[in-house]
Structure formats: C-alpha cells, structure tokens
Amino acid sequence: MKRFARKETIYLRGEEARTLYRLEEGLVRVVELLPDGRLITLRHVLPGDYFGEEALEGKAYRYTAEAMTEAVVQGLEPRAMDHEALHRVARNLARQMRRVQAYEAHLQTGELRARIARYLLFLADTPLSARDRQGIYVTVSHEEIADATASIRESVSKVLADLRREGLIATAYRRVYLLDLAALEREAGSALEAA
C-alpha cells in the first residue's frame, strides 16, 4: 500500500505501465493535458476501482493519474494475478466504462450551469464530500470543476456566483456547500452516476 497526498501524481502519461492499481481510500482522477495547455478530467476513480489498466497490456500509461484527496493505493503485478482476480478487474473496469459513458454524456449535454450542477451532485457521493454544521459540502477548486466540465475557471466562477446568489450553494475556500439539493437536481436535469 502506498499513500499519496492531494494533487500528488501516481503515474505520468508515457511512463512504462508495470503496475495495475486499486484505490483503497480517497479519490483519484485520470487526466489528459491538451495541446493548448488545458487539463481535462477523463474519469474519476472511486474506492475499490482499478486503474492503470495499461499494465494489463504491458504498454505505457496513456494518461496521468492524480490524487484528488489523500489516497491509499495498492499496486498489483498483473502477471502474478490469477484468473479470478483478473475477472474481478474486468468486472470493475466494465462498471467504470459505464460511468465514463455517463460522464461523456454529461460533458456533451446541457449548458455549463447544468454540467456544474451534475458534477457537484456527483461529488457529493464521493470521498470529496463531508458534512459540518452548515451542511453537505464538497472539497473542490474552481479549476478542478472547470477540468471536469469542459470549461474554463472564469466561466465556472461566474456560474458558481450565480448559484450562490440564488441560494443553491454557498462557498468557502475550496468548499462548495450544497444548500438546496432539490434545486441542484432540477438544474442538473439528469444524474451523473457515481457507482
């Protein structure tokens, strides 16, 4: 088991893929750096999920994996895995594929406001969420929301300010409080599957 701090890189695009990973605790995102310098989130890895699947083929990692929270990760040697273990990996990757397809639809449908609402509701069901006296919140930056909604930070900040003015959310440093879940769900239009 290995611990990673928030924002720490687990592997980089182009590195030789020798290890398949299983997330034990926390939240990881798989990202790609675009030619224009923007970072986009391709998928979120939840506890129990496998990632770094390029190791199953003995290829280089195609994307970069980064911890979004403190994360505990188990490294696995694919050649040492038995048939049943590989079957568990395949089932998990199939489940992740369904989430990725839902995520693709999320990015391609609706205005930015709807995409942000869907993403905040999605994060509420991940290790990025917590509760305090003010209610349920997610720990996320404007930049991370932009990366996950095919947008830019400035546009995200404007939408969050509008949602805050309307009483749907409140914000603090790296926290977005979800004050009116029903209204956010109406804004979202459809759910982004977390599990």
From Swiss-Prot:
User: Pfam family example for this protein?
Assistant: HTH_Crp_2
- Any idea which residues the entry calls the DNA-binding region? 142-161
Which GO molecular function terms does the record list? Answer: DNA binding; DNA-binding transcription factor activity; protein homodimerization activity
What is known about its subunit structure?
Answer: Homodimer.
What UniProt keywords are attached to this protein's entry? Answer: DNA-binding, Plasmid, Transcription, Transcription regulation
This protein is called Transcriptional regulator LdrP
Return the GO cellular component terms, semicolon-separated: cytosol
Annotated coiled-coil positions are none
Residues of the HTH crp-type domain? 110-182
Protein's organism: Thermus thermophilus (strain ATCC 27634 / DSM 579 / HB8)
> What is the stated purpose of this protein?
Activates transcription. Positively regulates PcrtB promoter upstream of the crtB operon in a cAMP-independent manner. Regulated genes include genes encoding DNA photolyase, phytoene synthase and cytochrome P450 monooxygenase, which are involved in carotenoid biosynthesis. Positively regulates the light-inducible gene cluster in the megaplasmid in a cAMP-independent manner.
The family database entries (PANTHER family) matched by this protein are listed as: CRP FAMILY TRANSCRIPTIONAL REGULATORY PROTEIN, HTH-TYPE TRANSCRIPTIONAL REGULATOR ARCR
Identify the InterPro entries for this entry.
Answer: cNMP-bd_dom, cNMP-bd_dom_sf, Env_Response_Regulators, HTH_CRP, RmlC-like_jellyroll, WH-like_DNA-bd_sf, WH_DNA-bd_sf
